[in-house]
Amino acid sequence: QVSPGSKTSAMVEYVDVLPTFLEVAGGKIRKNLDGRSFFDVILGKKNSHKDYVFGEMTTRGINKGSSYFGIRSVRSENYKYILNFTPDVTFQNACTTSTIFKSWSKKALAGDNTAAEKISRYENRPAEEFYAIQEDPYEWNNLADDYNYAMHKAKLKRELLRWMKECGDKGQQTELEALEHQGRKRQSKDIKRAEDTG
């Protein structure tokens, strides 16, 4: 049913994958699922699926992660808004201990300004980020403080806060409680690590 080589720029989320698989398999999609099937997009019957897609990330309790650094984001067709809960904390994860990242660090120490900028951008994140992703797909130019985009930023921020409320996401409070929702063995290990690193 799907044309070979089909492509789409429709925005979908991970939560949409399960209902899509269910529909493809001829199963019944329960109303309590968070996602919506994008089977019609795959079939070429629709060109779009959602007006906004949302993202979340935590470093709390993950491999090589900061003690806590929560990130939430929302994207529309043209713009992306990112909310970083703790901009005063250095962002860390498994990538910051990778061979590639270490090679950037080595270059930065040797005076390579490009490498130094990449490291700084990755580890030191501002409270808000806003990108015009059609013109800036790699998100280099943060427009969060640009007055010309203030209305677009405010609109996406409202959508993000609405979504967080709908999900019961209390922002930093949810981040700090993350360890309580992990397995006991992992939880005790991560609580000790969090206490050791402050």
Language model segments and positions:
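Long, internal low-complexity/basic segments
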Residues: 112-128, 133-198
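A generic secondary-structure signal for well-formed alpha-helical elements
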Residues: 24-29, 42-46, 78, 83, ...
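Substrate-binding rim/cap in mid-to-C-terminal beta-strand-loop elements of soluble/periplasmic
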Residues: 1-32, 36-51, 141
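Core domains of carbohydrate- and sulfate-ester-processing enzymes
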Residues: 79-116, 181-198
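Short, solvent-exposed loop/turn segments at secondary-structure junctions
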Residues: 2, 38, 59-62, 79-81, ...
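Active-site rim elements
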Residues: 2-11, 25-30, 59-70, 116-119, ...
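Short conserved micro-motifs at the rims of enzyme active sites and ligand-binding pockets
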Residues: 65-68, 85-86, 92-95, 141-144, ...
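Residues that flank catalytic or metal-binding motifs in active/ligand-binding sites
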Residues: 13, 34, 50, 70, ...
